[in-house]
């Protein structure tokens, strides 16, 4: 059963009418409701606010990293553990083939259902998760394998244990190491890109976002609480933070925006996976043909351009 967001109620009503028409075999009504649905959905999705895009990025049916891995990666083999503490289920590392191209895929996984969400810690990695990602990345570098990273986290886990085991050090270490990694890298925000938790696997030759994903230094709820001491101002905070793919492309913080299927990736997971796969293959082949020294220089130049002040 489809999950509808608050701004999709008219769409829900039309789809319910459409299903009823299909159940009774009313061909004329089906045609009318299909046209109505197309018209209403086009109008709704053409005028989405930043907050509505945030809702889509967090949609409970939105495909997660593991969904994409299962749809695009052949002969997948999972890598476990950081060799220092434990295996963190919030970070996935898989070796496999994407259309014949050997690839390491690193992804942040939120989980579905209560048990799985708890297992994945709601997609909030511990330091051992980031260390696992770095261990796998270093192995890929050693064997000359390109890396695809899928970002989807509300943020790094801020618990006492995580801080005691060096959460900030693990994130900082990844920023350093991934900036110098001598192998082609592509990072894609597939849902939420939350602060340092996202940056830890976000330093790459190419950084892209799915159309309805978000990337931010803080959650809009956290921003509203700090600036106005009022959680009700979350919509105002969302707009002020400039967290959408369009905003970040305009600011020069991301390289590309990957289009999503009509009404979002959750409506067509296979279509979303196809678009992501095509983007990866097109760009990774270009990166692999570049001189390694030139590729690293371009990555460095891109990072150095970030954080410019503009009035």
Swiss-Prot record:
Location(s) in or outside the cell:
Cytoplasm
Q: What is its main location?
A: cytoplasm
Q: Which Pfam families match?
A: ACCA
A GO molecular function assigned to this protein is: carboxyl- or carbamoyltransferase activity
Enzyme Commission number(s) from the entry: 2.1.3.15
- Gene Ontology CC entries for this record: acetyl-CoA carboxylase complex
Coiled-coil annotation reads none
Reactions catalysed, as given in the entry: N(6)-carboxybiotinyl-L-lysyl-[protein] + acetyl-CoA = N(6)-biotinyl-L-lysyl-[protein] + malonyl-CoA
Task: Return the similarity comment.
Answer: Belongs to the AccA family.
Summarize subunit and interaction data from the UniProt record for this chain. Acetyl-CoA carboxylase is a heterohexamer composed of biotin carboxyl carrier protein (AccB), biotin carboxylase (AccC) and two subunits each of ACCase subunit alpha (AccA) and ACCase subunit beta (AccD).
Function according to Swiss-Prot or TrEMBL: Component of the acetyl coenzyme A carboxylase (ACC) complex. First, biotin carboxylase catalyzes the carboxylation of biotin on its carrier protein (BCCP) and then the CO(2) group is transferred by the carboxyltransferase to acetyl-CoA to form malonyl-CoA.
Q: How is this protein named in the record? A: Acetyl-coenzyme A carboxylase carboxyl transferase subunit alpha
Q: Which gene encodes it?
A: accA
